From Swiss-Prot:
The protein's name in its UniProt record: Signal peptidase complex subunit 3
Gene Ontology annotations of biological process type: protein targeting to ER; signal peptide processing
Name of the gene encoding the protein in the UniProt record: SPCS3
Source species: Gallus gallus
Residues that carry a glycan: N141
Keyword Secreted: no
Record's subunit section: Component of the signal peptidase complex paralog A (SPC-A) composed of a catalytic subunit SEC11A and three accessory subunits SPCS1, SPCS2 and SPCS3. Component of the signal peptidase complex paralog C (SPC-C) composed of a catalytic subunit SEC11C and three accessory subunits SPCS1, SPCS2 and SPCS3. The complex induces a local thinning of the ER membrane which is used to measure the length of the signal peptide (SP) h-region of protein substrates. This ensures the selectivity of the complex towards h-regions shorter than 18-20 amino acids.
């Protein structure tokens, strides 16, 4: 331990060990925190169309447009180890061809420092809600759920589902007008 390089190496190794221990401490202090909050989802309008599907055989598929409201207070999720939240609204339903279908309709990233209270009114689907067939027409159990990924500074990336969902009955007829 006489040379400058060996002393610098020892100092660097010790500093790296201390930083690793501090990072683990940051992770362990928030690892078991409950990240679920109450969520209120309301659907004000569902529009259903039967359109030509250009992704496969030339058959027609169901395309839905959903207008919804979301209310949630995500303030309690944010602590010193949360960098951001990735929120997404998904629809789950079953058809005769598929036991479980999951479609993401909308998403949003909330950074630390942004307003974590959601009061969203008359939001439209951000992404197309296609069914690979005609499974949406008359479907009585399409469930909308708000979920989020907590992106931490250190630690695991948990997937959390909000404690509130909405089951929406879809219409029995297709809309033919071009209003949305």
């Amino acid at each position: 331990m006489n040379t400058v390089l060996s002393r610098a190496n020892s100092l660097f190794a010790f500093s790296l060990s201390v930083m690793a221990a501090l990072t683990f401490g940051c992770f362990i202090t928030t690892a078991f925190k409950e990240r679920s909050v109450p969520v209120s989802i309301a659907v004000s309008r569902v529009t259903l169309r039967n359109v030509e599907d250009f992704t496969g055989p030339r058959e027609r598929s169901d395309l839905a447009f959903v207008t919804f409201d979301i209310t949630a207070d995500l303030q309690s999720i944010f602590d010193w180890n949360v960098k951001q939240l990735f929120l997404y609204l998904s629809a789950e339903y079953s058809t005769k061809n598929n036991a479980l279908n999951q479609v993401v309709l909308w998403d949003k990233i909330i950074l630390r420092g942004d307003n974590p209270r959601l009061f969203l009114k008359d939001m439209k689907s951000k992404y197309f809600f296609f069914d690979d067939g005609n499974g949406l027409k008359g479907n009585r159990n399409v469930t909308l759920t708000l979920s989020w990924n907590v992106v931490p500074n250190a630690g695991l990336l948990p997937l959390v589902t909000g404690s509130g969902h909405m089951s929406v009955p879809f219409p029995d007829t297709y809309e033919t007008t071009k209003s949305y």
